[in-house]
């Protein structure tokens, strides 16, 4: 599958809100409500059933993100889609700003030290609250803060490489 055709997991349906078919959404976008900018959505149920959805709308209320979907008009319809994951095609996301990256684009890149030692490849990333962290799988798992320019010196998508200032023994 080409990179621009990849499906990117952005959130999931977590429950109903009220009686008229409003839906509580968990969003992993930043900011949270940005999930509504990226459409169409591919909804994937826990059993693997998939359906396309265009026209999802929503708003934030307190700590909740509330959505409405075309054709979902009551609580029973919402219950039927609880647990559904929300994906979008990679091509639905705008290009990142210079020196900003989508985590999904970093996954699979080889990580090298300044001295050329290969540490492994990026498995995934997570946020620890202070910064993002690269999880590297190689001969052993390593966690490196994704902090530019302190630790991450360069990201080269053409060479499929990230260069880091990191002690390979650490």
From Swiss-Prot:
The PRC barrel domain binds ribosomal protein uS19. Gene3D superfamilies: PRC-barrel domain (2.30.30.240), RimM (2.40.30.60). It is found in: Cytoplasm. This is Ribosome maturation factor RimM. One of its GO terms (cellular component) is cytoplasm. The lineage of its organism: Bacteria, Pseudomonadati, Pseudomonadota, Gammaproteobacteria, Lysobacterales. Belongs to the RimM family. Coiled coil: none annotated. Keywords: Chaperone, Cytoplasm, Ribosome biogenesis, rRNA processing. It comes from Xylella fastidiosa (strain 9a5c). Its main location: cytoplasm. Signal peptide: none annotated.
């Amino acid at each position: 599958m080409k990179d621009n055709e990849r499906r990117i997991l952005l959130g999931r349906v977590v429950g109903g809100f009220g009686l008229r078919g409003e839906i509580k959404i968990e969003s992993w976008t930043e900011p949270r409500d940005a999930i509504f900018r990226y459409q169409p959505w591919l909804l994937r149920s826990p059993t693997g059933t998939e359906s396309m959805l265009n026209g999802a709308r929503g708003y934030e209320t307190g700590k909740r993100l509330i959505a409405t979907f075309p054709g979902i008009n009551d609580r029973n319809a919402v219950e039927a889609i609880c647990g559904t994951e929300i994906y979008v095609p990679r091509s639905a996301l705008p290009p990142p700003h210079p020196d900003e990256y989508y985590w999904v684009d970093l996954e699979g890149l080889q990580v090298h030290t300044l001295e050329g030692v290969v540490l492994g490849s990026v498995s995934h990333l997570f946020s620890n609250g202070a910064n993002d962290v690269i999880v590297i799988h190689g001969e052993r798992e390593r966690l490196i803060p994704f902090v530019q320019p302190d630790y991450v010196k360069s990201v080269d998508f053409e060479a499929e490489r990230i260069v880091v200032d990191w002690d390979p023994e650490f």
